[in-house]
């Protein structure tokens, strides 16, 4: 799995929670609760949407901030696909759709330096 930054560990430490306390707040069960939190913090696994939303509730930060690296990767992929779709649909008469695709394609555009 690629190394993508997330901010779970720093937010947990700012909140003074232990991994076991976060695991309890997440509703994790089993012997390795703290280990599951550690794997999320180290990006050894991608948490479920339910778990990601629970992290948002615990730390009061949006998912896209807590998982910034993953968000940027996904946003770039969506932007690339929007460019392709926009090109494919360039001959369509639906200007609203074309405008929406163009905006999506440019939303996460990062010029190559």
Tell me the role of every PLM-derived stretch.
Residues 48-65:
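DNA major-groove recognition helix of helix-turn-helix/homeodomain DNA-binding modules
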